[in-house]
A protein has these predicted regions:
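Early-domain small/polar-rich strand-loop-helix modules and first-structured segments
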Residues: 1-51, 134, 184-199, 203-206, ...
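Nucleotide/phosphate-binding catalytic cleft detector across ATP-hydrolyzing
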Residues: 31-162, 226-227, 242-247
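Short hinge/gating elements
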Residues: 50-59, 186-191, 219-220, 276
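Glycine-rich phosphate-binding/hydrolytic loop that grips phosphoryl groups
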Residues: 1, 134-150, 202-207, 284-287
């Protein structure tokens, strides 16, 4: 996440957003919140990304410019921490540091080139001929982590399916273990994916919320409608999405208005969402992910390979069996 002022200057990034927000928790007047910009880098050649659903970039800024701004601040934070920890050793050896950036498995050459261009613009590299940057796919990095930490006891010829459920997309790919020491893998299925990441939950919730707000029958541009929408979206992002368990619970959101709109589920200052409404946000997304997983398993089984399985999530939501 980045926050830009009206002069296209970054006034907030990642966790450092105090100067960008008003006391209400929303961006100050004239400040634009920019998110999901990583998806902009992978638009070229990736048809399952819908540009219509992506937030607009700041005027005069390209997707590479915005990604470079974020990487610049990430690099500055990293340098500050390393200087505190290593002191003169870091200053002396900084020019020799190699960098590794992870990218989704389904990214094409255009997406990788855009990532590298953003890294150069952010100051990670001196120029295009600097070879200290390596791009590694996120699933491959996950497989290496599983091996090095002992999470999976991977043997030569084992297949491991990596399902990377990210913010914008879900990416899947299966690897076969070629060597245990040093650990190396090779693709054994073609990468697949879809735009069914966490932001798809937000889009589904937004559609349900807008339908409820329309039942309030307020005039276009109503500040009350805008206030209800903003508070519900924030509560879904910060609370409901993480805590949903499909256990019949109702969710009450403090929308901060005195008027009651029972037809929209607003009573005593709270808008209520049923378990079924929140389930509608999750079910199509989770079912699509399961479909992608099944297709990958079928491809692996067709090659008579042994698939290693591990659960690395604490999420308790259980989708329907359909």
């Amino acid at each position: 996440v980045l926050y830009y002022d009206q002069y296209q200057k970054v006034v907030g990034w990642g966790p450092d957003i105090a100067d960008a927000l008003a006391p209400t928790g929303y961006p100050k007047p004239g400040v634009q919140k920019v998110e999901w910009f990583k998806l902009q880098l992978m638009l070229s050649g990736n048809t399952y990304i819908d540009p219509i659903n992506l937030p607009p970039l700041p005027p005069g800024k390209s997707e590479i410019d915005v990604a470079a701004d974020y990487l610049f601040h990430l690099r500055q934070a990293m340098r500050n921490q390393l200087q505190k920890t290593l002191g003169e050793v870091f200053n002396r050896e900084e020019r020799n540091i190699r960098y590794y950036l992870t990218v989704p498995a389904i990214w094409n050459d255009a997406g990788k080139a855009a990532t590298r261009a953003a890294a150069i613009q952010a100051g990670f590299l001196r120029d295009e001929n600097d070879n200290r940057l390596t791009l590694i796919t996120e699933p491959e990095a996950a497989a290496m982590f599983c091996s090095k930490t002992g999470l999976l006891n991977l043997k030569i010829h084992d297949a491991v399916l990596i399902v990377d459920c990210g913010g914008g997309t879900v990416d899947l790919i299966a690897y076969e273990v070629e060597e245990e020491q040093p650990f190396s893998v090779a693709e054994c299925t073609a990468g697949s994916g879809d735009s069914c990441g966490s932001t798809a939950l937000n889009r589904n919730f937004s559609n349900i919320l807008r339908a409820k707000i329309r039942k309030m029958k307020l005039p276009d541009g109503s500040k009350t409608a805008g206030k209800v929408y903003a508070k519900c979206i924030m509560d879904f992002e910060n609370r409901i999405k993480a805590d949903f368990r499909n256990n019949g619970q109702k969710w009450a959101v403090d929308v901060g208005i005195e008027a009651e709109f029972p037809e929209a589920g607003i009573e005593e200052g709270y808008m209520t969402f049923t378990n079924e409404e929140i389930l509608q946000c999750f079910e199509p997304v989770v079912n699509r992910i399961l479909e992608l997983v099944r297709n990958q398993i079928i491809a692996i089984q067709a090659q008579n390979r042994s698939l290693q399985v591990s659960n690395m999530t604490s999420k308790q939501f259980t989708p329907s069996a359909n």
